[in-house]
């Protein structure tokens, strides 16, 4: 059983504040929820289990029981998950306030101990102080957290997470902030709490405390497309698709890292809860993570033989050719932007090949093919530039004054002509490696300009950012025909 979940279940009965703050979906009646997919720790109840996606950020971080309350660590309502979430620079005072909140919600005193023991001793087999009956008293106060970086902001979700060695398929990584506070001060807090426990429970408490307060922080993970809801990934190739998210909000006016102080003023806390409401947003999927996902998918379907072919049609419209016809049944081709990028890049590359190398048919086997397969994914900059350089070298360039040149005198489509004029000011007859890199980048950037594109989608924005963008009508990008250049 998850210690944090047990503590919330038992401690919520001691007063009105706890009854409100410690209410977890995992301790209530189960309701239908989206199917689970990943293994990890539920941020709401801290148990290690199968996770489903959050309705507030679409990341897999909530269990099927807790999903009924729809709580997200990015909410603006002072529920327990939000009060345990700290952002960016965490100070010693912030951690002191967190420890005070734990002591307020999960006190260990002689009175509390007697109360729990009396409630538990309903049968002779429960007379002994065994851990299975008093698991809720064995939750030490630690500065253990799960952290995640989202577009430059680092979030720390504090809690008591059991079994840290279990499989973790989420983008969150364990971080220990005890050095920011003070190990000896934290030891003192826990030794005082432990002194009230029966002797038979003190050893278990001490073991749990030291194992969760002396661990080495993990390396922070990179967020990728697989960490988001499968519903989002399945609709990425629809340019008009918008993600629907819900956020729990209230008139919370305190600084982000000071929300945990609200439990000290019960009347003020309940006044804020009276303003609680849910806000709905439709946001764009436009970001580097999802753009990379689409370009990588298209890269797997590339037919490089087209660059040596004599077909009169665009690369995506070739039919009945064993070497050049692509499989149009894949959903990635539903995105007209991917098709345009594919057609224009292959029109340009074929013009380069035909201008410089004597290859007459697409059935021939050429070394250049292995480098063409990486030409779409500009998000992997180092690998992409290496591929372009190898393609350039396969064109047998001529060196003049330490600069290599290739010819460019083959027919291209009008879209590529416009890109050439926009990127280098004319339709040239000779090109350098830098020109080739610039032109292919411009073809992709016309629709997916990753230079200024945010890394993670808008679903990971805080509520104040979402509100500002919503007022400016910027939560939805115009993807239905308007390019980044336009």
UniProtKB/Swiss-Prot annotation:
Instruction: Please give the Gene Ontology molecular function terms for this protein.
Output: metal ion binding; RNA binding
Q: What segment(s) does the record annotate as region RNA-binding? A: 1-81
Q: Which residues form a coiled coil?
A: none
Q: Which InterPro entries match?
A: Rotavirus_NSP1
Segments carrying the region annotation (Interaction with host IRF3) are: 317-486
Q: Which GO terms describe its biological process?
A: symbiont-mediated suppression of host cytoplasmic pattern recognition receptor signaling pathway via inhibition of IRF3 activity; symbiont-mediated suppression of host cytoplasmic pattern recognition receptor signaling pathway via inhibition of IRF7 activity; symbiont-mediated suppression of host NF-kappaB cascade
Q: Where in the cell is it found?
A: Host cytoplasm, Host cytoskeleton
Where on this chain is IKBKB-like degron (ILD) motif (motif)? 479-483
A GO cellular component annotation in the UniProt record: host cytoskeleton
Where in this protein does the record put region Zinc-binding domain? 42-79
What domain of life is recorded for the organism?
Viruses
Tagged with keyword Ion transport: no
- Keyword vocabulary terms for this entry: Host cytoplasm, Host cytoskeleton, Host-virus interaction, Inhibition of host innate immune response by virus, Inhibition of host IRF3 by virus, Inhibition of host IRF7 by virus, Inhibition of host NF-kappa-B by virus, Inhibition of host RLR pathway by virus, Interferon antiviral system evasion, Metal-binding, Phosphoprotein, RNA-binding, Viral immunoevasion
Q: Where does the record place the region Important for cytoskeleton localization?
A: 82-176
Q: What does this protein do?
A: Plays a role in the inhibition of host innate immunity by inducing the degradation of key host factors required to activate interferon production such as IRF3, IRF5 or IRF7. Associates with components of cullin RING ligases (CRLs) including CUL1 or CUL3, which are essential multisubunit ubiquitination complexes, to modulate their activities. Recognizes the host NF-kappa-B regulator BTRC through the presence of a DSGXS motif in the C-terminal substrate recognition domain.
- Domain comment as written in the entry: The integrity of the zinc-binding domain in NSP1 is important for degradation of host IRF3. The pLxIS motif targets host IRF3 for degradation; however phosphorylation of NSP1 pLxIS motif is not required for its activity.
Subunit structure and binding partners:
Interacts (via C-terminus) with host IRF3; this interaction leads to IRF3 degradation. Interacts with host IRF7; this interaction leads to IRF7 degradation. Interacts with host CUL1 and CUL3. Interacts with host BTRC.
Q: What is this protein called?
A: Non-structural protein 1
